Amino acid sequence: MKNNILFILAAILTISCSSGIDTDKLKTEKFTVYGNCGMCKKTIEGSLDGVKGIEEANWNPKNDKMTVSFDSELITLEQIKQKIADVGYDSDSHRAKDKVYDNLHGCCKYERPKK
């Protein structure tokens, strides 16, 4: 019984420590994503949760800078920016659809850059 418990704990630890991404292939990029608040942060970062190839995503509401570490063999920077735009947030190169932006919570409606 004791051996079974130790085996299960070792298996859980091994699985939880492995992201499946080859860290030697990770690329880190910084770019602008417009937003306002903590709710924006949750939505922006959440748009990349569980996306294959994304290792880490962090948006800073103080300077609108997004930092993403990803495996460029699994996902491109353009795809990442599109996923963020799909939830209503403009970046330096991708614009969210007006209808999606209009559905953001009031505190999340940032001043949109000119088209």
Question: How should each PLM-predicted stretch be described?
Answer:
Residues 102-115:
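Short, low-order "capping/linker" segments at domain edges
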Residues 88-100:
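Conserved short beta-strand edge segments in small beta-sheet-based binding/regulatory domains
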Residues 13-16:
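C-terminal motif of bacterial Sec signal peptides marking the signal peptidase cleavage site
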Residues 44-47, 79-88:
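Short amphipathic alpha-helices in soluble, non-transmembrane regions
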Residues 1-4:
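Positively charged n-region of N-terminal signal peptides that target proteins for export
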Residues 35-67, 73-74:
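Post-signal-peptide N-terminal segment of Sec-exported extracytoplasmic proteins
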Residues 18-20:
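Bacterial signal peptide processing site
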